[in-house]
């Protein structure tokens, strides 16, 4: 079986959670005898340091554009980097020539509409994975997504109508989401649709290998410091400037604390705000911005392992694949109460949750992990056991492969009752 995976954006230098999830899915599918190819927009970057290519995955590039007049190049770059509704004339022809048995869109809107139209033309199934959510998105995040459009004229509605982009979730053959709350909202809006809660995965054994020395060699400034680590692209929903603003109070209580932010700068105004806040607060020696590190690299794993705590401060986090990585690395996790972490974390057992609107709850969680050695050890041990049992790569990929196979049955479509029968293996929502 061959799968065509469609990405709205793929820049290895801006690697993030979506890319990690897709690569791990593809690697897991390989163990099930399923081959994959990636279809992604053009990139000026070299393929020499491309993790997909390094894993033996063919990456076919298509030309894509944002159909908007009257915006600056910076606004256009931000649209492409984070949430822009792109279109491509190349992608449809590329998919028609593909030998794929299933088309799997890891995007929504026009790009997913093109994938759906190609699948219907080829009479093969089409599925969508919602990596960033569709209905369970806070209003402030929606505002941030549309901010780059301000002052411009969006002329792509006719293109969207051509591929029925607004009906993708209604017309696709199955929707994967990693978020139970999102699944409930989708099932309510599309009661006849197959909505499948499909968690992401982590190669737990890889993250258990001790790489602390590699991290120390790459970043000697961390020696003797108590690290608070976060892995995230530098985009608005990750709420990183807020985290920086909490550091003076943390240092007042824990003088050796250092904040380590691992991730590529995908949104320029967020990068600028981070540097501005670090300078304003005099934290140049207490905040380490590593830039993007390769997924699964010794340096990345080592920094997570060196951390006293792994801290998420996101205002929107549909899943939180980095939580799985921290658990697998044996690091205690604290997180803001967004839908993904709320579904993942058992408060007090596998991590601690706090309210980002109430910073005192964040500091209470930090204090608990720093001061209570017994709790710290308990969180690490419980989370490590949990990730091994529930989120290792092969078992997750097997569930996706089964959905692909089910959709390829005669007539290529199951009834909803048929899908209900397989819910024990695919986590479909009642």
Predicted features and spans:
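Aromatic "clamp/platform" in nucleotide-sugar-dependent glycosyltransferases that forms part
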Residues: 315
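Conserved donor-binding/catalytic core segment of Leloir-type glycosyltransferases
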Residues: 221-238, 244-247, 260
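A short, well-ordered alpha-helix in the C-terminal region of glycosyltransferases
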Residues: 361, 368, 375-390, 399-401
């Amino acid at each position: 079986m061959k799968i065509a995976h469609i990405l709205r954006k793929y820049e290895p230098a801006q690697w993030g959670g979506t890319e990690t999830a897709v690569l791990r899915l593809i690697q897991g599918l390989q163990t099930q005898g399923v081959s994959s190819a990636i279809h992604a927009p053009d990139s000026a970057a070299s393929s020499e340091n491309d993790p997909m290519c390094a894993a033996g995955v063919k990456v076919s590039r298509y030309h894509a554009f944002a159909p908007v007049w009257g915006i600056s190049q910076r606004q256009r770059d931000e649209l492409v980097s984070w949430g822009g509704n792109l279109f491509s004339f190349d992608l449809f022809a590329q998919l028609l020539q593909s030998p794929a048995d299933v088309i799997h869109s890891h995007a929504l809107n026009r790009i997913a509409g093109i994938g759906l139209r190609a699948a219907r033309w080829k009479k093969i199934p089409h599925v969508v994975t919602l990596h960033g959510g569709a209905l369970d998105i806070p209003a402030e995040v929606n505002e941030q997504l549309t901010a780059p459009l301000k002052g411009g004229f969006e002329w792509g509605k006719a293109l969207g109508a051509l591929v029925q982009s607004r009906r993708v979730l209604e017309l696709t053959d199955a929707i994967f989401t990693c978020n139970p709350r999102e699944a409930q909202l989708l099932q309510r809006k599309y009661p006849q649709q197959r909505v499948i809660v499909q968690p992401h995965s982590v190669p737990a054994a890889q993250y258990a290998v001790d790489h602390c020395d590699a991290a120390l060699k790459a970043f000697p400034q961390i020696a003797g410091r108590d690290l608070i680590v976060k892995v995230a692209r530098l985009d608005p929903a990750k709420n990183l400037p807020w985290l920086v603003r909490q550091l003076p109070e943390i240092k007042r209580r824990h003088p050796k604390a250092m904040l380590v932010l691992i991730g590529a700068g995908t949104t320029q105004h967020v990068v600028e705000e981070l540097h501005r806040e670090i300078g304003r607060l005099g934290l140049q020696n207490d905040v380490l911005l590593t830039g993007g590190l390769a997924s699964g690299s010794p340096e990345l794993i080592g920094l997570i392992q060196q951390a006293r705590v792994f801290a998420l401060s996101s205002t929107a986090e549909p899943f939180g694949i980095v939580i799985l990585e921290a658990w697998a690395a044996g690091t205690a996790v604290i997180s803001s109460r967004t839908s993904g972490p709320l579904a993942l974390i058992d408060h007090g057992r596998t991590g601690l949750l706090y309210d980002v609107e109430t910073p005192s709850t964040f500091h209470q969680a930090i204090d608990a992990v720093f001061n209570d050695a017994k709790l710290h050890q308990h969180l690490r041990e419980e989370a490590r056991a949990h990730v091994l049992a529930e989120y290792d790569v092969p078992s997750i990929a097997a569930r996706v492969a089964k959905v692909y196979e089910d959709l390829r049955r005669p007539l290529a479509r199951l009834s909803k009752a048929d899908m209900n029968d397989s819910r024990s293996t695919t986590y479909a929502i009642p």
